[in-house]
Amino acid sequence: MSDSEEDDVANLLDLSATDEYRVVTFYLKPEDKKENFSITQKNETKNLEKEISYYLAKEHILYNTNRVLYIYNEKEWTVEKDFRRVLKTLQKKIQDSLTRKNKKYELLIGVGKSVKGYHGLKDSFKDSKVALEYIDLIREVMGDRSKAIVDCAKLGFFQIFININDKEELRQYIPDSVIKLDEQDKKKNSELISTLECYLNNKQSIRKTSELMNIHTRTVSYRLSKIVDLTDIDFDNIPEILAVRNGIVILKILEQL
């Protein structure tokens, strides 16, 4: 879209060149991937647009093929938490309604970065789409399989890495220890990385790791011992553990590329 076309749209929607905006993308993810861009999905998305208008300003809601966009003006919400609360309420109620009607869709919401003026909206829209594209990976990394609202502004370093599409460049950020464990897993199907990740995500608790992975505590201890033997990892070294955690995330990003 050219600058003049953006100006026309901005005049139509009464958008400012100085206000702070975010693009919020609402997407109905079909249980069956073949249903993406289907007529059924498009019809459900049109219904979604109507539902959203009960919660958010109708004049800033746009239907876009198989998505609904909302242009969020930060000055219209004096407390950002109020907007987040509305999004959570909206998502839950609409999802509950879909479930009751046996509609095989999941309502996902991606929140783009804050931009100044309407000319930056395309960048915010791009960010909101990225949040949705990587929703499964984000859920896994954050340990929350039910997470349905993703804010790009809160992804931190994760967003930096998902913007790198060169696999070899990404590999440079993976510590040797993680690479060794990945190679071992591929050879022996040993589940060392998944065990290590679960262990680190649960305050290095063997018991909790055992419960979540549904394996015996002795199995967890054995795998951790194997991890130390292979990598000489120091679980008390905070910078090293941070690098390992980041490396595991990057490994998952690589699997998505």
Which stretches of residues belong to each language-model region?
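Cytosolic nucleotide-utilizing catalytic cores of signal-transduction proteins
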Residues: M1-L257
